[in-house]
Regions:
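Basic, helix-initiating cap at the start of DNA-binding domains
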Residues: 1-39
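An amphipathic alpha-helix adjacent to DNA-recognition modules
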Residues: 12-20, 29, 50-78, 88
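Short, hydrophobic secondary-structure boundary micro-motifs
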Residues: 32, 106-109, 168
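Short hydrophobic/aromatic patch on the recognition helix
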Residues: 40-51
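Hydrophobic alpha-helical connector segments
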Residues: 60, 75-107
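Amphipathic alpha-helical packing segments from all-alpha helical-bundle domains
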Residues: 89, 114-161
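Hydrophobic/aromatic-rich alpha-helical bundle segments in the mid-to-C-terminal region
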Residues: 137-142, 147-149, 157-198
């Protein structure tokens, strides 16, 4: 990394860690530009040199929480030898981690952002490549996809290639999984369903 990138990463890390502390103390709804700047020891205006808006900063702070999921995936996939089992295990791992921190995962995958999420995720992993861990090719492709629908589709496509799912059913199956997941995640956030039952 060149000096400019190192400096950018360092300053962004101050803001991300400050936002992460606020998430732990007050939840995502407690994050404001002023609170983050004060905690990081900077002027509020400085944040806008590194982040487009508050949602961009919240996304990056939330991405730190997805690291646990990314690092847990290899354990879930240890003895998996086909695409269908991989599909099931990735969803199992994803649900386990996302239902523990539903607001974080909602902020990442269902946020209302200015740019395409893939640009933000690409930028994040370019600055913090260690956050993604070491993953099999199929899984790293899925992790780098820009939205939850495309992430799921990467797994479903592998099931189609191996003959577990008919090509004409692929999009429907993926959409059903995504919609069911989003509905359950919202119920967990609203405390309408217990995390253990989800």
């Amino acid at each position: 990394m060149d000096y400019k990138t190192i400096r950018k990463r360092r300053v962004m890390t101050y803001f991300i860690e400050a936002a992460d502390e606020i998430i732990k103390e007050d939840g995502i709804s407690g994050i404001t530009i002023r609170k983050v700047a004060d905690k990081a020891g900077f002027n509020s205006a400085t944040i806008y040199n590194y982040f487009e808006n508050l949602d961009h900063l919240i996304l990056f702070a939330a991405m730190k929480h997805i690291k646990e999921y990314a690092l847990a995936l290899p354990k879930y996939l240890y003895n998996v030898d086909n695409a269908l089992d991989r599909f099931i295990k990735v969803w199992e791992c994803f649900c386990y981690h996302s239902f523990k921190e539903p607001e974080i995962y909602y902020a990442i995958f269902f946020a209302n952002l200015d740019k395409d999420l893939s640009e933000y995720i690409g930028e994040y992993y370019k600055l913090f490549p260690e956050e993604i861990g070491v993953q099999p090719k199929e899984v790293s492709t899925m992790l780098l996809r820009h939205n939850i629908y495309d992430r799921g589709m990467a797994l479903v496509d592998e099931c189609v290639k191996e003959g577990f799912i008919r090509e004409e059913d692929a999009e429907t199956i993926n959409e059903m999984c995504t919609l069911i997941y989003e509905g359950i995640l919202q119920k967990v956030i609203k405390n309408k369903i217990d995390t253990d039952k989800a």
